[in-house]
Amino acid sequence: MNFNLKQKLDLAPKKPGCYLWKNHLNEIIYIGKAKNIYKRVHQYFNGPKDLKTSKLVNEIFYVEFIEVNNENEALLLEANLIKKHKPRYNILLKDNNGYPYILMTKEKYPRLIYTRNFDPKKGKHYGPFASSEMKAYDLYNLLLKLFPLKNCFNKKGRKCEFYDLNLCMKACTHEVSEADYEVMKKKIDYFFHNGADQVLKDLKEKESIASEKFDFEQAKKYLDLQKAINLIFDKQIINLYSAKERIDVLAYQIKENVICIVLFSYVSSQLVSKNTICDFYYGEEQEVITSYLSQYYKDNIKPKILYASLDQANATLLKDSLGIEIINPTSGKMNEIMSLALQNVTNELSQKYDSLVKKEQRINLALDQLKKLIKVDKLNHLEVYDNSNLFNTDKVSAMIVFENNQFNKKKYRKYKIKDQQALGDYHYMYEVIYRRLYQALKNNFVDLPDLIILDGGKHQVLAAKKAIVDLQIDKKINLIGLAKNNKHQTDKIVTFDLDEISLDKSSALYFFLANLQEEVHKFAISFFRKTKAKSLYDSILDQIKGLGKKRKQQLIEHFKTIDEIKKASIASLSQVLPIEIAKKLKQKLDQS
């Protein structure tokens, strides 16, 4: 333990709050919460430590403390900090489960919005729609036709693009009363809570009335809506998301330093989703569980009741901070469901434990083989580079980072080749390595890799070597290239001195390097395709009169990705653009 850390620990507050362990690069590696910060942080260094805690403690270089009023606040703060910083030793949840919701906003005249983010502050969420049988975006577009709520951002009382098309209730000009609007909101709520039967019945009646009046165009419209409902709407699936009560069941199991957690969500006694995480863990087991739940319910609907085996202190803490009743079932139907969850978690752990541990062992073996081969002592931080282009257009390069036995995606970097005169991999590699190491030079070499790996042979190694020599830092950097044979298979390592070392294709090292190549290639190709797509997208947009820089930016901010813009209907595009421009854009995108 260094002097600064010891001094900081001695001054730790004896109050509730969060502690942030940092490594020698000042990176946050673990975040925890405590009722008494002083007691908790000293537990890491006092008394016997198991393997998992020892690994964490060996990397601790400094610590920060954040005091709060009580343990409830500490738990919520911990979840926010973990989501923000994503420390590698915390059990991390994905940013969201990828399932979409349909949101009714809290505005005076609410809008329906298709979103993948759960944020109760914005309004009422219907979903998540996890089933592949339910095409949620099709359902969203259908709802806009069935229930024509406000579909624009107009706040100035002027007619919107949907007004003359009769695709909205004319809320933009305040021609609809709040009472009528409230009726439409209740119809949507009824639709989700009770299914499509009533809507289908109403549409059938409207179709009959229109036919009797010989208004066959209107009758066909009502018939098409019925067909659309029957095509994408599975009543049973919708009912799973419409019940007033939701119950979650959590089970977990530990084997050595691996924890497996399974969370079931039930609505109307039917299982609607299952979330599983299996990973190495650091810290106390109940602390890990409370941290997991606090993170999970930040981005997911909270149940009325959570059934889980938690000690009284943590159950009370979660109840107070999250507002969820927590019950440890001992008999009856819920005990049977808990047994099912335990059976699932046992199966998950048995399936994943060996693969997790064996993966760790294979990585350690591969790194030991590489150390011996290139005669280095330390390989904790690797950077791998690859270039991608098509006939010297849209030239890009990518860097991935493998650190402490895992990919560190926070440190991945994408590079657009700036030198427009540069032609070929030699020049691209020189520029990228020079830019990366020049940045390190400016930062006093705080985050230099132990080894740079290039997806290429002597040609690329020569380019990187020149960049290193030009920056006069050749004594600080280890470098290798991965050379391919005439069958385009990697079979040699090229060293800094351009020596070639053959690889044993049955070794752990060979498969490890192949995995690094696959990851960096995938990352580089993905970036290249996005760059290429953006070039094409920009050229299409430039052909459309009325689409300036500001409107292009609004499109990206609203739809997030080019793919989402391509999939958007004219109605959706019209939420951002004037209707005529939206039509032209849709036509161009369909032709591209």
Swiss-Prot record:
GO terms of biological process kind: nucleotide-excision repair; SOS response
GO molecular function, one term: DNA binding
UniProt keyword terms in alphabetical order: Cytoplasm, DNA damage, DNA excision, DNA repair, Excision nuclease, SOS response
Pfam families, per database record: GIY-YIG, UvrC_RNaseH, UvrC_RNaseH_dom
Superkingdom classification of source: Bacteria
Record's GO cellular component terms: cytoplasm; excinuclease repair complex
InterPro entries linked: GIY-YIG_endonuc, GIY-YIG_endonuc_sf, GIY-YIG_UvrC_Cho, RuvA_2-like, UvrABC_protein_C, UvrC, UvrC_RNase_H_dom, UvrC_RNase_H_dom_sf
Subcellular location: Cytoplasm
Domain UVR, first and last residues per copy: 197-232
All residue ranges annotated as the GIY-YIG domain in the record: 14-91
Predominant subcellular localization, coarse grouping: cytoplasm
Cysteines paired by S-S bonds: none
Subunit-structure text: Interacts with UvrB in an incision complex.
Role this protein plays: The UvrABC repair system catalyzes the recognition and processing of DNA lesions. UvrC both incises the 5' and 3' sides of the lesion. The N-terminal half is responsible for the 3' incision and the C-terminal half is responsible for the 5' incision.
Family: Belongs to the UvrC family.
Protein name: UvrABC system protein C
The species this protein was found in: Mycoplasmoides gallisepticum (strain R(low / passage 15 / clone 2))
